[in-house]
Design a protein with these regions (language model features):
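Alpha-helical transmembrane segments of polytopic membrane proteins
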Residues: 107, 154-157, 198, 287-292
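Membrane-water interface of alpha-helical transmembrane segments
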Residues: 3, 7-14, 97-100, 104-107, ...
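Periplasmic/ER-lumenal interhelical loops and adjacent helix-loop junctions
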Residues: 44-53, 86, 220-221, 228-303
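Active-site lumenal/periplasmic loops and adjacent helix-entry segments of GT-C-fold
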Residues: 27-125, 130-162, 190, 279-281
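Juxtamembrane/interfacial segments around transmembrane helices
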Residues: 61-75, 162, 187-192, 208-209, ...
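Transmembrane helix-loop junctions in multipass membrane proteins, especially transporters and channels
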Residues: 29-36, 96, 174, 210-217, ...
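Start-transfer (signal-anchor) and selected internal transmembrane alpha helices
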Residues: 1-30, 223, 228
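Membrane-embedded helix bundles of polyisoprenyl
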Residues: 17, 112-124, 130-211, 223-243, ...
């Protein structure tokens, strides 16, 4: 059976990003005797959290675990990190103790999937599919990815986010239903925190790409709200308990007031400017402005 050009493009992007991932991470995996390690939160939180969640699900502690601090709700504690991630679900097929050896390979898989999903979206806008593959590499190996290697679960979000952009295009341009709702479901289930930012981005995207240009503004808006709402509702099995857990935290009662709610301090703007023209740095030891800076501030325009 002959593959369609679009499918071939996605497979090429998947394979190319997979190969680049192996070349990038493979050396460090081998150097670590099979284990990919970094420092700080990656070693002390990300890997232990995945091991604990894996063990909790397999032992039936799906609602509460005494192994988290003084005891905590499993869904509330880990839905931000991994519970809704398809990558984490794959690790359930393997022993929890194998996770330190799997992390590097799952990084490679996440980069490959990010390449495939971004290519699926980008190819909708180019005649020569090679440019979609090139764009997929720029996306999956972006500065955000490199700067946030420390945060293992961020890469799950990057891998699946392009699906929502692809889904909204399929819905409003090709008039294919249900695809967008499913992509919203996947992303809402994956990470409630990032999902809020993704929704804001999608609203802006819809307004610029469709609303101000389309003659069927009302119909398009209703369709987006309907499928978006349906996808969000389907994710409620994990999303709702997560939101309830967050709202029960006393910290959410604290408010940012005054100018601090609207603008950064002056040094922060210098940090953003520095990130545009200088390569990203180790988050815990910055060369200037801040001793440690954890806001994923990296762009580096020369690249």
């Amino acid at each position: 059976m002959r593959l369609k050009e679009g499918t071939k493009c996605i497979l090429h992007a998947l394979g190319f990003n997979l190969l680049l991932g192996v070349c990038t991470f493979g050396y460090f995996i081998l150097k670590g005797n099979g284990i990919f390690t970094l420092f700080a939160d990656f070693n002390n939180q990300q890997i232990p959290f995945n091991i604990l969640a894996n063990q909790a699900i397999k032992t039936g502690e799906v609602f509460w675990s005494w192994n988290i601090d003084l005891g905590s709700n499993i869904i509330g504690a880990f839905s931000f990190y991994n519970l809704g991630s398809p990558f984490f679900l794959l690790t359930l097929l393997l022993p929890a103790k194998a996770l330190p050896y799997l992390a590097g390979w799952f990084f490679i898989l996440k980069y490959a999937v990010a390449g495939a999903t971004s290519c699926a979206y980008l190819q909708l806008f180019v005649k020569d599919k090679k440019y979609a593959v090139l764009g997929s590499v720029l996306y999956s190996f972006s500065g955000f990815q490199a700067a946030n290697l420390l945060f293992y679960h961020f890469h799950d979000v990057v891998a699946l986010f392009p699906l929502m952009l692809w889904g909204i295009e399929k819905m409003l341009v090709e008039k294919k239903r249900a695809i967008f709702a499913f992509t919203v479901f996947l992303n809402a289930l994956l990470n409630y925190f990032f999902f809020v930012g993704e929704v804001i981005f999608l609203v802006i995207y819809f307004l610029i790409r469709f609303f101000f240009k389309s003659e069927s503004r009302l119909k398009d808006s209703v369709q987006c709200l309907t499928e978006g709402g349906l996808g969000t509702a389907m994710s409620a099995v994990l999303l709702l308990p997560s939101v309830m857990f967050v709202l029960s935290n006393p910290s959410v009662e604290e408010k940012i007031s005054g100018m601090g709610a609207l603008v950064f301090d002056g040094v922060k703007y210098l940090q953003i400017l520095r990130a545009l023209f200088f390569p990203g740095e180790n988050m815990s030891y910055s060369s200037c402005l801040y001793w440690g800076e954890w806001s994923s501030c990296a762009a580096y325009l020369p690249m």
